[in-house]
Amino acid sequence: MDAEREPAGVRAPRRGTARAGVAVGAVGLLLAGCASMPDRGEVREVRASQGVDSQVRVFGVPPADKASPTDIVDGFLEAMTSDDPQLETARKYLTDDAAKNWKPGSTVTVLSAGLDRFPVQGDKESEGHRWKVTGKKLATVDERSAYQPETGGGRYEEYLQLVKFKDQWRIATPPSTLVLSESDFQRIYKPVNKYYFGDGTLVNDPVYVRQRSDPDSRMDPTTQTVQSLLAGPSKWLGPVVTTSFLTGTELAPGTKSLSLDGQNTLRVPLKLDNKAAHVPQSQCQKMATQLLYTIKDLTASRLDRVELQRADGKTTLCWVTRASAAPLANRVPSQVHQYYVDKDFRLVRMSLNVAAEEQQPQEKPESVPGPLATAATFKVGTAAVTYDEKRAAVVSEDGRGLYVVNMTTAGPMPPALLSSKGKLSAPSWDAHGDLWVADLDPQNQGLWRVPGGTGAPQKVDVAGLDDGRITGLKASPDGVRIALLVQKGDGRKNLYVGRIERPERKGDVSPVSVRELRPAAPQMADVMAMSWAPRGRLLVVGKENGGITQARYMLADGSMVAASLPGAAGLTGIGAYEDEAQPVVASSDEDGIVWLPPGAQWRTVAAGGRAPVYPG
């Protein structure tokens, strides 16, 4: 298929792929030439698609008659980026046997830029010729559709064996996965959240599905997401979550498309094995709750109800609405205050009205009730508030002591729960009511957890920290992840997310630990502040190499930048919340405490202040 009419100033692709509705630069650098294999050749780069909109469909172009080995290699690499059913065009570049047996499935190798490919000398007795394909490996997407960032800066290397049959060159050994540049990956795939239960709370599990129908299954994005949900959690999250779907539960055979009806209801037909055929209503409703939150994140339409059906599409197993699913999901409260430390080192709270016009005054911030309101000589440095807003954890202004105070009753300041000879980080509460803090003292550095905010502090083992030093942290609202700012020898701070593993049984004395740290903001060379944000994202203030300060929403798996905030220069602290109706709050060198109403510019709350936070 050829590209349609060529717009002025844009070159249509000579070979490789055609894009419906628009002509853009070809991904491959394709050469005309004879069919004989060159004895030697220079490195050639197959560049990524530049500026290709995710709404543009890409179709592969089959190999020309007697195409050169160069064209075969380039054409195949480019055809892997197409939207062809069953990747049928890419298979035309393969031998018959290779085309039948090539099953990349959902696995993808993501490269930071284009591919280098060049011919290499093969064995004297080997039939045909070999080409080496290399690139900088950014990540892989595994069979569970989960993004796995490459932490070692590794190189991708693959050898393609070419053979000649009836005067036609073909590839006999294709790669085991799809190989895509980062830009092509973002054009073809989109991030979605699946939801599983972690200690009674719904937890998001980020994965990637195709923007359009999957080439193999022909499922639309919603159906792909449901299928991924039924298959189970990602390997990284799996140890700390469970699913309500019984083993053997599948989509009804032939299900390719799922969509909301006129009543904003999604009906999902399921094939149940004998064990799952008589699932209890309570468990079925938890299954439907997982689906409702998963699809609610995926669709722009309002989803009000999810109905699970048997495979015949006639018998209803159970259903949930937004209202009935909310208690089962057990998410954090939506109506909360914003908090910060004012210029007099007092912890204050406010309730910002996002509906107010810019000229309308907001309610004046007030000191939090309880001992902090009457402790005239105590100076607060940083703070964290429980999700029920009944207790506050504060670190003294000198950074030496951690205190937990009640905000519902008056009384004297309690003694310190944890003391440091150096400095303590800002604290953080998780959804279980446990308190987290890092000790920055070089002689005693580490991560500490205070069970229930009242127990004896416990030092937490953090696997993979190596020689890094934790300087900041934030537990996720679901309580199964923790974001850590880690400083290493060069003085820069990088952001990692670790999995919180807790004892499985009551009475189990094995310690809580943090496992499998993975980079959450690899695009940032230095991170200054961060906060958890809606849908399991992170709001990060930092700099790229040689860049200016930016505030970006990042996906917690480190895969891509979701969005950016305007006017981030000078920000020193940031606070966001699980409920998207709540505005972002921040501290600024020049303007003090500021907040960002939806669709507006930053507004000032107070001329002085620091450490803005939401509960958590």
What are these regions (language model features)?
Residues 2-13, 21-24, 28, 35-616:
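Bimodal "functional hotspot" detector
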